[in-house]
Amino acid sequence: MAHVKVKTGEYTIPALTTQDFTFWWGDDYLPAAYFNVSIEPNAEGLGMIPLREERRQLTTIAPNGHRQPQLILTLRNNNHFDVPFFANHILVSV
């Protein structure tokens, strides 16, 4: 049976910028698990241009000796205002 865990973080991308955001699961990551992050803009009541995912990079880190994936998303905000967003992290392991 698969185990699914979800975490949500809140971030903001400034107006008219391209910025890298780095995500990882943390200490309870298990080898051979599936890790991903989805982005959900939270610009309530604003007519907005969608955020663009310019690049997606995946690497492995071991900050305390335990291997875990690290996802680097490059996002572009073409709006003339800052856009807050949720980063929904998912980890699936068996």
Task: Give, region by region, the residue ranges found by the protein language model.
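Extracellular attachment/recognition segments
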Residues: 2-83, 93
